Structure formats: structure tokens, C-alpha cells
Amino acid sequence: RQISGTILTRELKQHTSIKDVASDSGYFVKTYRELVEQVAKLSYLNKDYLLFFRGQANDYKNKAGKSTFYPTIYRSDYLTQQELDYRFDKLYSASKILAELFKKHKVEGQTELRRKKHIQWSILQHYEVTETPLIDVTQSIRVACSFAQLKNDQNTAFVYIFGLPYYTNRISINSEHDLINIRLLSITPPQALRPYFQEGFLVGTDDITNEYERK
């Protein structure tokens, strides 16, 4: 069966289109129930995709006026090559220290963590240790709403819905979409409870680079 394209709900079609969704203003809902209803409809209409959520206090636009979702390592109004190199050096140093600490304290999963950089980066990103090339998302609407309202003194908040390919492993690499999807619940040791409370996932591209022109 051919994979279908993204389908919007009737209400969303009256507000925007697939082509313009990134540049249009968000679809306003007044209640949590309204949000859940839209999510339920989107999930039903888009069976070929798994829905993930991200909550933010603000909608960050690029120069073209479109919503953007940059990993922390690439975020800056003006990011120089020198700063980017520094951030990657800091990431590699933090990864090495994390692996050493796991080994020292005999944390479960230490052997695999030392071998796989994406596991190292996922833990560093989720616990906000340093900038990484990954973005936090969740399968919980409630968690996304909580993050959208965290330290938010405005009257509005933003919850984004992403339709991503179904994951097949703990670390799923989709070469067709150049996408990595990491299920935190499956890679973090049981001592790390935050991913279980937040139903956390990390997503990024397989082609991770510190080349400024390609960021």
C-alpha cells in the first residue's frame, strides 16, 4: 500500500493548508478537550504516521516567517563557525565524561552507552547538560502542554504536532526521510526517571555536521 500524504482536519483546512502551515498563525483552541479532539482526528486521518508533540511558550520564526525547530547546538541569531566548532567540542567532551561516569558508577547500560553517540547525546540533551543536534518531543499531549506553559507569563502557548514515521527500534534511522528517532524510555537506565514521566523521544537528522553552511 502506498504511503499517503498528510491530511488536515476539516477545521484546520479552514484555517490553513499543508503548504502554508509553517507560515500561518497557529490554530487556536480554548480548552484541553478541543486540543485532544483535533489530535484524535489527525491521528485517525494520518494512519501512516505516528504523532509526536512539542510544547513551547513562543513560536520562533525564521526570516521567511516560517516556524523553525533548530536543535540547541545550531540555535543563534548569528552563529559563527568558531562558535559552532566550540559547541561540538563541548558536546564531545561532555559525552566522554558521561561515558566515564557511567563506567565508574557501574550504571546499567554503560557498555552500550560508550559505543553509541546517540545514546550519549540523548541523555545530555534531555537533562539539558549541553547543546546537542537533537530535539525533544513527546508522545504525551499533557507533557507538551506542561512545557508550553512552563515559565510562560503570556496568555497563549504553542503545542506543535509532528507526523513522523513509525519507529521500529530503540534508535530508528529512516534513510528516506534522513531522520533519527530515539526512544528515551528504551535507552536510559532505570535510575533516570524523567524520560518515563515525560514519555520522551529525541529526533534529529542522520547527517549531523559542524559545517556552518549546512547547518
What are these regions (language model features)?
Residues 1-215:
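Catalytic-core elements of nucleic-acid end-processing and repair enzymes
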